[in-house]
Swiss-Prot record:
One Pfam family named in its UniProt record: Aminotran_3
EC top class, as a word: isomerase
Family as reported in the entry's similarity comment: Belongs to the class-III pyridoxal-phosphate-dependent aminotransferase family. HemL subfamily.
Protein name per Swiss-Prot or TrEMBL: Glutamate-1-semialdehyde 2,1-aminomutase 2, chloroplastic
Disruption phenotype: Suppresses partially the ENF1 disruption pleiotropic developmental phenotypes, including the suppression of the abnormal patterning of the adaxial-abaxial-related gene expression in leaf primordia.
Catalytic activity, reaction form: (S)-4-amino-5-oxopentanoate = 5-aminolevulinate
Length: 472
């Protein structure tokens, strides 16, 4: 079966002769034009020959052939795919295969790839220069948008990645409280800084590593860990480390151990415990920020942390990160205060431009209702396909974020997630790839929908899932 929707889409009676289908080229165009399909398109064989050649060359140039481990397909097997272009809900590889994309550049592409308005705005900004190393007015605009949207943020500092945001916010929490220890949760990923690489999720979980060589013991000696959704374990840590804990940092919805939601009593309890013990609560919303709701997970759950990290969506697909929170805390950041942090490309005009135009689109009425609708349809459809074909599966969604596991469930923490049949997931992933659907190449990563995804995309994906599952 061809991975292009030109070939795979025959069952639905749709095809597209252009490089990208019309429904992929504009998020506002919700229709796919019915067209005739050539014999060549119908019989086109799925191949990754060019990807294989490119990847083999890359392995001599970059460690493992990639610049981020999960891209090497270590946990799913098969040939890593080398991508060429993307538009709307579609991504195309160098062999010409086109896929419905549920990775979305790992979250940023919430309005769809290569949005025309964002590209036009970037073109205008580039005429003025790509980076100044000095303040620009666009920083003010995006900062005002973030502050008005996110309940906890009264001041914000822009950086260049989610990792950098988490590094900065932890240093700030320690500076403000005068304490050194902090709590993170097993399977939660907060970037690759030394202090966080303890029982981490994301690519670390994908490779089956408890942590990373090269991290000094001293760097993690103040890192305390607890199982996610276990409030009793958190209380015990505070009891055993009285007056020493600066902060708790968590993904309010876990996306780096797969998709795991918090129990209501857990997230409420964390807020209470930090207040009672003079510790700060940090929400790592690099993934959930502007995705679960315009104000992020904190708006969705009605829990306001002291500090928040952001990334992905606020850069509209360009490298970006941010941390922000209460004014009295943020005023400790240099040059307003003594806590030093800096960056050559922080607040650069290109990332600010893409972020501004992405947030403008997300602020429109009906945005999150639409994301919720299509993601519900997708998640329920895949789980129903699993039920029909006799596979133990569980999963869930919130707005434009979803996930599923090959286990009976429920999944409340990383230890539950590890019960998933990862070998079966790998087979499912490879089968879906051949059917023209690109999922995250790891059982331990959440999936994402976008405003560019259509009902036809969702129905195609569900049909493909049932087809693949019936063969497993």
């Amino acid at each position: 079966m061809a991975a292009t929707l030109t070939g795979s889409g025959i069952a639905l009676g749709f095809s597209c002769s252009a490089k990208f289908s019309k429904r992929a080229s504009s998020s506002s165009n919700r229709r796919c034009i019915k067209m005739s399909v050539s014999v060549e398109e119908k019989t086109k064989k799925f191949t990754l020959q060019k990807s294989e050649e490119a990847f083999n060359a890359a392995k001599n140039l970059m460690p493992g052939g990639v610049n981020s481990p999960v891209r090497a397909f270590k946990s799913v097997g098969g040939q890593p795919v080398v991508m060429d272009s993307a538009k709307g809900s579609r991504i195309r590889d160098i062999d010409g295969n086109e896929y419905i994309d549920y990775v979305g550049s790992w979250g940023p592409a919430i309005i769809g790839h290569a949005d025309d308005e964002v590209l036009a705005a970037l073109a205008e900004t580039m005429k003025k220069g790509t980076s100044f190393g000095a303040p620009c007015l666009l920083e003010n605009v995006l900062a005002e948008m973030v502050i008005s949207a996110v309940p906890s943020i009264e001041m914000v500092r822009f950086v260049n990645s989610g990792t950098e945001a988490c590094m900065g916010v932890l240093r700030l929490a320690r500076a403000f409280t005068g304490k050194q220890k902090f709590i993170k949760f097993e399977g939660c990923y907060h970037g690759h800084a030394n202090s966080f690489l303890v029982k981490a999720g994301s690519g670390v979980a994908t490779l089956g590593l408890p942590d990373s060589p090269g991290v000094p013991k001293a760097a993690t000696s103040d890192t305390l860990t607890a199982p996610y959704n276990d409030i009793a374990a958190v209380e015990k840590l505070f009891e055993a480390n009285k007056g020493e804990i600066a902060a708790i940092i968590l993904e309010p919805v876990v996306g780096n151990s797969g998709f795991i939601t918090p129990k209501p009593e857990f997230i409420e309890g964390i807020r209470r415990i930090t207040k009672d013990n003079g510790a700060l609560l940090i929400f790592d919303e690099v993934m959930t920020g502007f995705r679960l709701a315009y104000g992020g997970a904190q708006e969705y759950f009605g829990i306001t942390p002291d500090l928040t990290t952001l990334g992905k969506i606020i850069g509209g697909g360009l490298p970006v990160g941010a941390y922000g929170g209460r004014r009295d805390i943020m005023e400790m950041v240099a040059p307003a205060g003594p806590m030093y942090q800096a960056g050559t490309l922080s607040g650069n005009p290109l990332a600010m431009t893409a972020g501004i135009h992405t947030l403008k689109r997300l602020s429109q009425p009906g945005t999150y209702e639409y994301l919720d609708k299509i993601t519900k349809e997708l998640t329920n459809g895949i789980l129903e396909a699993g039920k029909k074909t006799g596979h133990a599966m569980c999963g869930g969604y919130i707005s434009g974020m979803f996930g599923f596991f090959f286990t009976e469930g429920p999944v409340y923490d990383f230890s539950d997630a590890k019960k998933s049949d990862t070998e079966k997931f790998g087979k499912f992933f490879r089968g879906m790839l051949e059917e023209g659907v690109y999922l995250a190449p790891s059982q331990f990563e959440a999936g994402f929908t976008s405003l560019a995804h259509t009902s036809e995309d969702i129905q195609f994906t569900i049909a493909a899932a049932e087809k693949v599952l019936s063969r497993l």
